Amino acid sequence: MRYCYSRNLRASLLCLSAFLLVIFQAFPAASRIYIDINSPLQKKIPIAIPRFHYEGGDGVNLSMGKDLADTLNNALAFSGLFQGLDPAVFLQDPEKMGVTKEEIKFSEWRFLGADLLVRGSYQIQGQKLGLVIRLFDVINQKLLLKKIYATDLSAARQTILTFADEMMLHLTGELGIFHTQIAFVGDATGKKEIYLADFDGSHIRQMTRDSDMNLAPAWAPDGKEISYVGYKRGNPDLYTMDLSTKVGEPISMRPGLNIAPTYYPKGGKLAATLSFTGNPELYLLDAKGDILKQLTINWSIDVSPSWAPDGQKLAYVSNRAGIPQIYVLDLATERSTRLTFEGDYNTSPAWSPRGDRILYAGLHDGRFDIFMINPDGTELRQLTGGEGNNENPCWSPDGRLILFQSDRNGSPTLWVMQANGTDQRRLRLNLNGSQTEPDWSPRLTRAAP
């Protein structure tokens, strides 16, 4: 599907070799531009976001205008689609700039190289915040989006992220990932515990406090709970945690391994590896941990399941060929097909939410790197290389970003990159120690705990 709005960016963007903005004209009077988020050639779109204009209220609070603009700028930069202009090059004081189409001097912004401009204004009354945010097409001097919000001061960040999501929807046809979270394992306390953070690494919360090892967090499709592996009894057992209560409840404490949980895409059940029969096999469990079905039956070790988004297939790791490789199980036929043939050790598959690609970590030249392959085994591509061990990849819910752990700077920490392997950068987590085993949440509709 293509998403569009505005026409005359063609000349400018062709000169810049953008390819990210594609021009489409359905009718002469209603032409639009759109951002092709699937383009393999992506040039970041220059966008100007001056400090929000203070419109009055209870006292003067100009610093908040900068905070609001910075929050939006940082969120859009995280997406990898936008390049924010340095406020130092702006030609006017933001408090003297216009905020409406009639007041804005588009020629100045075009001179600075901006393709898009966001102008925001705000009012404060007690603990209430009023916001008006406008998105402009600088080239065509058009208002593209206007949103008005009335909220609490404490919800300022979430409101700005809501606008960022709306902006992405308007530009690309898809909501952004700005109301998502990540779960991961951290050892800041000296023990491996489960943590949550916002998509960009902010708002860190420790979820488990068992003074024992907790591993492999996995999000439920509705974002209301996570499953994980806990060692409270000294054995790897499966737990689920309702995020509203932050209480972990055991669902499988069978003898041996109870590991590698992953939720069925439509919820209500999950796949996991159990070894109570003596051999690690994949099983389908209901929400209470009761076995619905044994998915694999063989002498080998079968672990690390990852669902296709339609729930009809499952990627997993098996050593049935003598070395760990990625296989795909068709649940309808109950047949498994080997997916990977390159490399002697491939693990941690992650199926794209779009269904078209599978990530995994493979041992290459003595180090683990992230690879991507089509579900039919074609178009194998290496995404990381030459910088430490890169493992445990997972997808953002829109399939555009990849989160993974890397020890390229020493201890393992979390990194993010575009789906094509570009723009690799460390996630900003204000947390000591290592961070491993990330999992990205679905889009969330309520505030995080």
Q: Which residue ranges define each predicted feature?
A:
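Short beta-strand->alpha-helix linker/helix-N-cap micro-motif
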Residues: 36-104, 118, 122
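Short loop/turn segments that connect beta-strands within beta-propeller blades
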Residues: 139, 198-202, 242-246, 286-290, ...
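Residue-level detector of Asp-centered blade-edge/turn motifs that repeat once per structural unit
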Residues: 177-178, 221-222, 265-266, 309-310, ...
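Hydrophobic beta-strand positions that form the internal "hydrophobic ladder"
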Residues: 182, 226, 270-271, 311-315, ...
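Blade-level signature of beta-propeller repeat domains, shared across WD40, Kelch, NHL, RCC1
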Residues: 411-449
